[in-house]
Amino acid sequence: YTKGRMTTDKVENAFGQIPVVKVTYTGKDLPQMEQQFYPIPGKNYFLTEFTLNGESAEVESNLMAPINIDEMPQLLDKGTNRALFIPFDNDKWVRYQSHPLTFDKLTSYEVTAVFNNESRKGFVVGSIEHDNWKTAIEMQSGDTNNLKSLICYGGAADELTRDSKPHGALKGKSIKSPLVLFGLFDDWRTGLEEYADANALIAPPKAWDKAVPCGWNSWGVLQFGLTYPKALEVSDFFKNNLQNNHFCNTDNTVYIGLDSGWNSFSEQELTAFVNRCKANGQIAGVYWTPFTDWGRQAENVLHDAPEYKYKDVYLYANGKPQELDGAYAVDPTHPAIEAQMKKTSELFRRCGFEYVKMDFMTHGAMEADHWYNPEIQTGIQGYNYGMALLNKYFGDMYINLSISPIFPAQYAQSRRIACDAWNKIKDTEYTMNAVSYGWWIDRVYQYNDADHVVLKDATEGENRARITSAVITGLYIAGDDFSEGGSKEGKERATKYLTNEDVNLIANGVSFRPIEGIGTNSENQFMRQDNNTLYYVVFNYGEEEMSVNVPLERIGLNPAETLNAKELWSGAEIDLSKAITIPGKDVKLIRIQ
């Protein structure tokens, strides 16, 4: 570009009336480029985006980078600084990671934080718009103190976005990059929370005026052993043993959820199950995968749209159906998929279900050769189209996403924070890996979900740790087989450990924050401030006993003050001036007042 012109103005948007600095670039045979910078009054961040305008012809691009820093200034204190890897979705047991700046190249999805753990000062870069683009932040390391370069761009498509072809191109007289936030914060954790809040301003979380769901899901143990009689027995077990003994949410409600396998029930059995739940003071839940074909039989006719075969609805890449997790991806914009949504939602509504777990959502966000709707140009556009339809048909139910991208987030009340988790300390550690660096996601959804808590075939310490991982994450969902033929151990452990009143009171749906950001796998210390009460959690993911001193100053407390502390699993009073001991594969959950 040969010419540039800067102007200032004010605009009104979700952030209020804010200043905008526009820089317009022109050049021979080039589309006009206009970059906007929005400094947000009272905040430690600015927003930026740019448009390409074709004067006489359409413009087309599948990569637009509003932030491109080729020589990164030293923004942080010198020291062993870190950069976060945030995954695009939660499939295939993907893990978050805090990296020392010793990598050649690191790509994070939608957002990253780069920070000094000791001072906690850090900067956050990420997309706050998720209508058209999958966004990535690509970083190159200079040395352990600083990055060499950073580029934040719309147009990410690779193995970790589950794509097998390049990102779709936006095409039109005018095309726009994602809107990106760049902020410098005294505490990187606050920075990620403010990033989430900015997202929620633009796309508010799906409304919910009831308490966080607490209950049961059949996939924990029963899986495809789920039957109608067993489902009734589970509902009765909760009524008789748990929900009258502190295992319920603050609405005194328990959710009993049928997962995959419910389709072996007749409609009459489904209705009778829902009615049993209602009689037991419970809400019935169910399960569906809207964007998948598990049969993978291209010539089969769609049951709910018999004028179409499955080959008509696949999302093709390079002429082939796209397979992920054993299922083919289907086109969220195809009328046959809408017909399936309509018929399935009508069935759920006739039966009386009020909660639905939606799974394998990333299939609907894949890049493709084309979509049925010709206006769709990118995978995320297709996903938004499909999710809006999902809300049209299921919007009066509670929607909990399971395997899914983090963004867009406005179509469901909650989302599972990681992949599947069961009963062992490794399941707790894996769940807490996502909470370590993704706790803030409960600001773009109503709640995070730590998956089903299974208690059988694990030590009692592992039980305490796994339950703690749920109550400090969000949704509180048990998973053992509580039918009459189910494990005696699972029932005894549930009656013992799912009924601790002090522990269960913590489960208000607000995720705990990490205290540090340097875990090689997961952080093991977390906290939440509730008015004048501070909760401190320390996990021991290892086999051997460990001792820790509660880091009072790091969690914002004055060691000189008189503090009362109680460990909630044992009920024991804790002397905060002394080290506390955590047995192997266990947890301490401490309330400090």
Regions found by a protein language model. Name each.
Residues F46, A470-T473, A478, E516-N558, ...:
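Carbohydrate-binding surface patches
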Residues F50, G172, W216, I399, ...:
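Conserved, mostly hydrophobic/aromatic
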Residues I69-R82, E553-W569:
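Solvent-exposed beta-hairpin/edge-strand motifs
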